[in-house]
Structure formats: C-alpha cells, structure tokens
Amino acid sequence: MKFSELWLREWVNPAIDSDTLANQITMAGLEVDGVEPVAGSFHGVVVGEVVECAQHPNADKLRVTKVNVGGDRLLDIVCGAPNCRQGLRVAVATIGAVLPGDFKIKAAKLRGEPSEGMLCSFSELGISDDHSGIIELPADAPIGTDIREYLKLDDNTIEISVTPNRADCLGIIGVARDVAVLNQLPLVEPEIVPVGATIDDTLPITVEAPEACPRYLGRVVKGINVKAPTPLWMKEKLRRCGIRSIDAVVDVTNYVLLELGQPMHAFDKDRIEGGIVVRMAKEGETLVLLDGTEAKLNADTLVIADHNKALAMGGIFGGEHSGVNDETQNVLLECAFFSPLSITGRARRHGLHTDASHRYERGVDPVLQHKAMERATRLLIDICGGEAGPVIDITNEATLPKRATITLRRSKLDRLIGHHIADEQVTDILRRLGCEVTEGKDEWQAVAPSWRFDMEIEEDLVEEVARVYGYNNIPDEPVQASLIMGTHREADLSLKRVKTLLNDKGYQEVITYSFVDPKVQQMIHPGVEALLLASPISVEMSAMRLSLWTGLLATVVYNQNRQQNRVRIFESGLRFVPDTQAPLGIRQDLMLAGVICGNRYEEHWNLAKETVDFYDLKGDLESVLDLTGKLNEVEFRAEANPALHPGQSAAIYLKGERIGFVGVVHPELERKLDLNGRTLVFELEWNKLADRVVPQAREISRFPANRRDIAVVVAENVPAADILSECKKVGVNQVVGVNLFDVYRGKGVAEGYKSLAISLILQDTSRTLEEEEIAATVAKCVEALKERFQASLRD
C-alpha cells in the first residue's frame, strides 16, 4: 500500500522526521518498502494567471501569453501546451527558477517572441509522467504563491507491505491508529457529519445470501453532475497513493477506500430494474464487467443483481451495464460488509485482483459501513451536487462477526516475552489499541476492536503488547536452560551424506514446487488420482505431486531450452499419494529422485562423445545404495512403469519390498514433454533406506585369493542378479566375490538363451585353499544354478 506522509499526518502528527516515522512503522510490523518525494527538486515556481493568450505569429503550435504572477508587471511567456487559455491559473517557472535535472530558466526568444519564464506541466516538475499539457490550477489559487507550498509538495509517498493479517492497515486510518498508539497521541479523525435525507427516493434491497453479505447499505443520490471536475486536493491525494483520477464519482469511492479502507461502488440508478438483490449467481450466468470482458459465473459467486440480471460481482468488480457514465444523473451508492470466505478465490478464478477484493478477502471492519456511506455522500454532494435519499440498511446480526473475549494471563505474557511489563502499561497498551479491557488478578479480559480480525487468541494479545511496548525495549537476556548433547545413532544414514555423494558425482541439487500441472502429471502417472488444490496459484500448479519426476523433467526441459544439454540433477522432497488408510486420506513419503541426460562426460578433446545409458544411472544409484550397507540385499527386477521404457527400466526391491524405479523415460512421454534425447530417471523411498546396516569389521585374509571363471547358459528371462545371488550362497565362508563380466548372445547359444560369464573369487582367512576344495565349490555353484535355473555350462 502506498500513501502520502502529509495525509497520514493529518490524522496523527508525531514530532519526528520522515526517516524516524518510516522506521517506527517498520518496527510496528508494517514493513516500509520505500520512501520517495512526491515531486522533483525545484524552486522558483509560483501560481500565475494567464491574462492574455494569442496565437504566435510565426508558429502554428505556439501561443504568446501575458501572465500575472503577482509582480509589478505581466510576464511575456511563449507556451506550446494545447490547453493554454485565457483565465487559466497555472504553475509558472520564473526567470532564475531551477527545475528538476538542474534545468535553469532564463529569458529567451522563441521564434522571434520574448519569453520570460515557462508554464509547467506535471512532468516538468517531476510530479508525474503527465506531459499532455500545463497544470490547471483551481480558479481560486492565490496568485504569486509558491507552488510547492500551494500543492504541498514537500511530502513523501510511503509504501508499505501489509501482511494478510493486518487488513485494517489497508487504509490511512489503520496506519494512523498504529502511529498514534506508538507515540501515545490522539487520533484526529476527519469530522463526518451525517447527511440528512432531502428526498424520499429509495430502491428496494433484498439480501438472499446473508451468510455471504451480513450487511448491505444503499443510498440514492439524485441530480449529480458527473462531469464536475475532481478537486485538485483529492486528485493529488489519490495520485500520491498510486491511483489515477477517472471521474468525480469514482474518485470519491476510491478516496473513501484509501482513507477508511472500506470499498464502495456506485451504480447508475436509472439502469437498475426493480431493485437490488444480493444473491449467489445462477450456474452459467454471465456478466459483462466494467473492463468489457465477459465473466461466466459459478454458483458460489456472490452477485449484486436487479430483478432481471446480475449487475456486479459482489466485493470484486462492477458490471458495465450499470456503471456510471457521462450521462449518469442519479446514482445508488453501495457500501457493504461481505464475508471474507465468500470473496476469497473468486477474483483469481476470473483472472482479477481488485482493490476491493484485496480488502474483502482479508476482512473489512463490519461496523464501518455507516461512517463510510456518510463520508462518501458528503464528498459526492460537495463535488457533484445532488440530493441524497435515506440510507437503507439491511443487516443480519446473526451472521456478522462476533467479537470474543480473550483472556491474557500474566504468566503467559512474561513467559513468551521473557520480560516483565508493568500491569498498568499492559492495560494502557491494550486500551490504546482499541480493546475493551477488564482487569483481573494476574490476568486481563480483552475484547478486540471490530477492525482487528487478527486478534483472536491469547498469543495475539502477547504479540500486540510486545509490538507496542517495543521489541528494542526488551532487554537481551541469556537463555536460562540446560543444554544436553544429543547422540547420533550410527545406523542413521544422513540424507546430507547422500547429497554430498551425488554432488561429488556431478549432480546438482534442485528444489521444485510440490504443486504441478495435473495434465503433465497424468502423462507420467496415467490413471492415478492426485490431490487437487482448492485455490491454486495457477492452473499449471493445481495438483500435488505424486512423484518428484514431474518437477525434475520440467527442469530438464527448461535447461535444454537454454542450450544446457548435459544435465545431472537430483531432489529430495515429499510426494503426496491418496491413501484411504492414511490420516486425512493422504500419505506423504520422503523421496530421493534424480535425472541425467546428455553426454557421459563434460566436453573434452581427449574423450569421445558418449551418451549416458541405463548402466550409468544404475551405477550411480548403486553407489547411493552402497552407503546404506544394503546393496547386496537390493534387487533390480524387470517391471513395467508407464513412464519408463519397457526394455530399459527396472523396479528396485529391498528384501522383497519395492522401494523405487530406475530407467529410461518412455519414448512417447519423451516426445510429449519435448525432451531432447534419451533421459534417465530414478526415484527411491528414502525412509526405507535411512536405517543403514552398520559396517562390521572383519579380518583381512593373509592368504592368496583364487579366481575361477565360469560361463553358464540360461533362459533370456532369467535376471543376472538372481544368478549372482545364488552363487553367493554357495560356500559362504570362502566365496568372497562374485562378478558378472560378460553377456553373450549369438553363435553357439540357442535363440531365447544367453551366456553369462561369471568370476568367482575364493579365499580363506586361515589357510591357502587346495585345488580340490576350489573345484568342489565351483562344481557346487554350477549344480545349484542347474537345479534352480536349468543352467548349463557353456562349452
């Protein structure tokens, strides 16, 4: 939110400079993002009046003027602005004036005519970007007055970040309340005198959705001049808040919005048929908005309608049909309290974000509407004329927010703050904040003010007391606690250790959103139902991820589109799997996943360009599994996964339980995702691996190891891992190593079979093995393979 410092000081004016004020606001929890002067640095510019205005004899686009600046004579000034005319009060830079950019005004001749100054536009004074013409001042602007003084340009715009819980500070009144409390000053509110009804005109108002709209006020104002100019003082206040002046009616409602934080809307009364009905939209109902776009409404969208059609989206945006235009003479002013839940998410659904919806979503003071209506009525009549009818108030007390009594205990206050604040100070702070306070023994009973939706529980009151007391005033004290050194189980494998290993292997860690595109996720996990968000950031981020692959593959595409073809990335994070047996019907699993693509090695003059394959990723994965001490218990089994290539993928099993997948991305998926070349992925359920096997020390044999190689022929569908596992079971104490070093298919091996060449390493820790023992062990191994897999020794 952006506002004028001088406007704030009209409400409360502490004796501190701008920098101190900004720091004070920040320390109060309203972070100041910036403080900027409202105008450039200049001097020598005064209010003047164009007494004469004639066409320049030598230039079609210039005019020769005589300007009264309050001196002993009129100044001759040449001006090229299209709006220059006789009788206009203007901003005049006299000779010797210095404008922003160190531009000095001197006497000169323009196309043969003398010019003793300059008539200035807003842009030339550094006030705004408007350079369409010279500044037009009110007819009563005092001639000769310094323009900085007249327009109050010695001012700053202060921009603050208002957190969602402090919706009360989305108006000058809310910020002023905080500044008043912090400086122990009274709040000087503008006098708002009720405007009595001078006509009896009303419109019938019916509220059919009291839960969504507990309070609705309407008032007819007839005979207004919508073309009346908005006063310069109001335009300037709006401009300094970042709001562009549109017309007097809209400017008045915007002014009340910025001043009091209450959104308002004006309807063209003559376009309303029958009366006002506040209801939920009908399914499929449409509304043409003020910006000309057509919105298709849902049944949960609140609308303001007449007896035939929707006129506006309640609390969000007005409709084109009932909007105020140049022909409008009679208006209906609307001022309402809409429930935050009835507005939240509705604007985003239609791609909208308005000042009104921003405030209603966070909560508007439910007792503010009468004050805002009277303020807007008075301003509208003062500027546009007209006569006001009575205020029609439709209020459902049962659905208005209720203010609960909150108990603040002395023990809780001292414990959370860590400092004792005197009872009378606590009481004073709460009352200055607007709370109704009843003191008790070692406690306070407080009722929060209507504008503070965020004060609901005891901790909220503690926060408010500490904030107003001043965090800087709470002394630093050492923590009074005993620190117990924690122990670390040797069996716990740190995920950080695994990340370090992957980093050493050239992988980079990434963090992707848990919110993913449901369409892309369905490509990776077809037929699996994901958890959908009720209020997503965007349609492309509306589902919770079922695996980390969705985000990782999107990251690969992002990098490939930026000429990064060799990618090695990994991520650890939660996946969200629907599970009726889990709490709330959703299971959260910690996963570790990775992706590689491109060349095996970085580009090098002495290395051939080789693309990564299944065994590159499998090898990296085995290094990770080796850290767990369970690599020998892990099996890679051929198992279908719709996201992976059926012939180049595997499921990973640990002790018979599946813990993940590894493989090449399915060619069809690769095409749909626009992946460039072969891409390989893996994913592991980390919690099933985190409890590692503690290494056991064993004696290193001093006796020679013996290697024997065998080649066995088995059916094509027999996994090599099963063959190796069976070999390890034979001669457990003597077979210290089993490795597959060749796979052969072709001449000499029947079709549908393969030859596996296996090396057996045999060794004993107490003696040198005899040849007979070695041969017996090898024979035993061959026999076991023959019995289980119908294997035969290859000739």
Curated annotation (Swiss-Prot):
Family: Belongs to the phenylalanyl-tRNA synthetase beta subunit family. Type 1 subfamily.
Assembly information from the UniProt record: Tetramer of two alpha and two beta subunits.
InterPro entries (alphabetical): aa-tRNA-synth_II/BPL/LPL (IPR045864), B3/B4_tRNA-bd (IPR005146), DNA-bd_dom_put_sf (IPR009061), Fdx_antiC-bd (IPR005121), Fdx_antiC-bd_sf (IPR036690), NA-bd_OB-fold (IPR012340), Phe-tRNA-ligase_IIc_bsu (IPR045060), Phe-tRNA-ligase_IIc_bsu_bact (IPR004532)
Signal peptide: none
Coiled-coil positions: none
Pfam family, one: FDX-ACB
Disulfide topology: none
Domain of life (superkingdom): Bacteria
Keyword Nucleotide-binding found: yes
HAMAP family: Phe_tRNA_synth_beta1 (MF_00283)
Record carries keyword Nucleotide-binding: yes
Location relative to the cell: Cytoplasm
Cofactor note (record): Binds 2 magnesium ions per tetramer.
Designated name of the protein: Phenylalanine--tRNA ligase beta subunit
PROSITE patterns listed in its UniProt record: B5, FDX_ACB, TRBD
